[in-house]
Amino acid sequence: MNGVTSHASSAVALPDRFIHLLSSMIRSPSVVGAEHSFFRVLQRELEERGANVTWYEGVLVAQGDEPNSVMFSAHIDRHGLICTGPNEFQYAAFVSGARSDLLGNSVSEQLMKKIVNRFESESVFAYEPWSGAYRGRGLIDRAYICEFRNNLIFELKGLDHLVAGTPVAFRDNLKSENGALVGQLDNVITAAALVYLFELGFQGTAFFTAQEEAGKSWRYLLEWFRRFGHSTNQLIVVDTSPYPDFETAKQQTLVLRNRDANAVFNTELTRKLVDICEANHFTYQFKDKYVEQQNVLAKQRGDEPASLGSTEMGRIISASNGLVDGTTLQIPTSGYHTLSESAPVESVAGFLKVLTDLATLN
C-alpha cells in the first residue's frame, strides 16, 4: 500500500494518494523548533496541488481562490531531540519552550519520568534545520534526569560529531496493522489531510503552524489574524486526541470539544460538526465531557483530577479578544507522543469525510 508496511487489512479503505502522501511526509523530519525544512516539503506538496503558499514566522499559509470560505489549522512539529553539547541531547519541546529549572519554568518531575524511558534504544537521525540535509544516524543509548539542572538528558550512539543546536529526529515509517495507522502521527497525519484537501480542489485556507508542542503556535496564528484577518474569524483546528489504549480510542470515530482549560469553543460551529457526523453516521465524543467523567472516577479512587487540556484553539480564543473563534476536530489515538501512536483507520476515513463535507468538496 504505497510504501506502508501492512500486517492486516481493514474493512475501510483509505485513498491511496492520501496514504502515499502521509508515508512521504512522515519520513521528513520536523522536530519542535527546527521545522523549516518541513515547511519546504509542505510548500512543494501544496504548490504542486495548486495552492498559493506564503511563509510567515512560525506559520505557512496555503490558500485557494476562496480563502475566507473555510479555515483549517494543523501544527506540523513533532517531538525529537536537540543537541545541547558534546554527546548531550535534550527533549526539543523543553528547549524550544525554554522550560528548564534555570528560568523557574521547570518541567514537572512527573512529566520527565513519563518520557525518560519512552524512547529507549530508538533509532534517530540528525539533519540541518533549514535544508533538511542528512547529518548522520544513531541510537538512543541512555536517558536520565540531571539532578543539577533538573532536566531530561539523552545520550546517543553514533552522533558524537554533532554540534549544539543540531536537531535529531526519530526514524519513522508509516505502518498499517490491525485496523490502524501506526507511527509518530501527531500531528503529521492531519497536516497530510489538509494537503490532500487541495488535491481534491479545496479553495479555502489552511494554516500549518510550528512549535505547538512548546506552546507557541497559537501566537503565530494570532499574529497572522491581527494583520490579515477580518473583524471576526472562524477557525477549525485539527489534531490527534490521546486515549489510554486502542480499544478506548476506537470507541468513537471522531473527537470534538465544547471547550478546553482556556476557553469555550464556538457553539454554532461545533454543532455543525455534530450535524455532519450524524449525517454520516459517525460516532463522536466530546473530550471535555470524557475528562470530566474520568475525573469523577479519579476522585472516587482518591487520585488527582486531570486537566481539560490546553489546545491551540483554546489559547487563541482566550488571547484574541473576539478576533478569532472556532472549534476543534480530532482523530482519536492511542500511544500518544510515541513512535507507535495508533489511529483507527475508520477514524481517519471519517476525518477525511468530515473535512470534505466542511469544504463542500463532495
At which residue positions do the language-model features occur?
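N-terminal hydrophobic/helix-forming segments and targeting peptides
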Residues: 1-362
